[in-house]
Design a protein with these regions (language model features):
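S-adenosyl-L-methionine-dependent methyltransferase catalytic core, i.e., the SAM/SAH-binding region
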Residues: 1-300
Length: 300
């Protein structure tokens, strides 16, 4: 990509989705449009793509990048949990291929005003859609120490959640919690010194981002409707980036494949027995790919 953005696990995604002329495809986490562009190129001259993203800024960037494909592209501002509704509204149900990339996009991380990163100080926002819901600052102002500890422990899998929560609440009560930079420093001070070399705020920022955007609930809602989005033989690819996401995806896909022990009929066939990860070359070239895990399935 000319903007320096490299979509994660692109060859693997294209291999599983196998885009073809005349097909209909959905990228439910459009981002900068890297995967979408490759799908459109593979499905030329008349394959159609519906791109969904809850971040309006991402839609602007991707819209400009994909403009050359004209009316083969339909972009919709919505969370991926509304995918079936969106596809129905634009007359694209069922689709031949469906992609979900659950990672935070590089522009979100790189722009301090979005509040996702502690590398450059910015407002405590962290919303995927800046027009919706409470910010991280709002959340931190309303929760008590016990609630905050639970968020950090459950969504960040942080062993020092109690210490961090106490430090954050104390700083809040002193009026010191006013930016991502301040939050990162507060978390670092609460951590044992021997943990400082590992970007100590990473797990806490992940936890707050998940809580602000209701990310795990969004994934559950999406997986409830995925089979209804796909035609028989249609393919699904989901890329997760941390264990909380991947556990949900693995469990729900197994259930859809009739392997949950509930007696429910199978609606999909799992395509990869083991999770697919990036190869050494991609991991060296694209650091974002190092934690990516791809699972694929086919509608029965």
């Amino acid at each position: 990509m000319s903007d320096g953005h490299e979509p994660v696990l692109l060859d693997e995604v294209l291999g599983w989705l196998d885009p073809r002329p005349g097909g209909r495809y959905c990228d439910a986490t459009l981002g900068l449009g890297g995967h979408a562009r490759a799908i459109l190129e593979r499905s030329a001259p008349d394959g159609r793509l519906i791109g969904i993203d809850r971040d309006p800024q991402a839609l602007v960037v991707a819209g400009a990048s994909l403009a050359e494909f004209g009316d083969r592209v339909t972009l919709v501002h919505a969370p991926f949990s509304r995918a079936l509704e969106v596809l129905t509204e634009v007359g694209a149900v069922p689709v031949d291929g469906f992609l979900v990339d659950l990672g935070v996009s590089s522009p979100q991380l790189d722009r301090p005003e979005r509040g996702f990163s502690f590398r450059d100080s910015g407002p405590l926002d962290m919303r995927m859609d800046p027009s919706q819901g409470e910010t991280a600052g709002d959340l931190l102002r309303r929760v008590d120490e016990q609630e905050l500890e639970s968020i950090i422990r459950d969504y960040g899998e942080e062993r020092y959640a109690g210490r961090i929560a106490r430090g954050i609440i104390a700083a809040r009560d002193r009026g010191e919690l006013d930016s991502t930079g301040a939050l990162g420093a507060i978390v670092a001070r609460a951590m044992p010194r021997h943990e400082w070399h590992k970007n100590p705020a990473t797990r806490t920022f992940q936890a707050l981002r998940i809580a602000v955007n209701h990310e795990l609930e969004q994934i559950e809602r999406l997986l409830d409707q995925l089979a209804d989005c796909l035609r028989p033989g249609g393919r699904l690819c989901i890329i997760a980036f941390h264990s909380l996401e991947d556990r949900i995806v693995k469990r729900r896909l197994r259930a859809l494949a009739g392997r949950a022990g509930t007696g429910a009929p199978a609606r999909v066939r799992l395509l990869n027995k083991h999770v697919v990860v990036a190869g050494d070359a991609e991991r060296a070239r694209n650091p974002r790919s190092r934690s990516a895990k791809l699972r694929a399935a086919e509608r029965i």
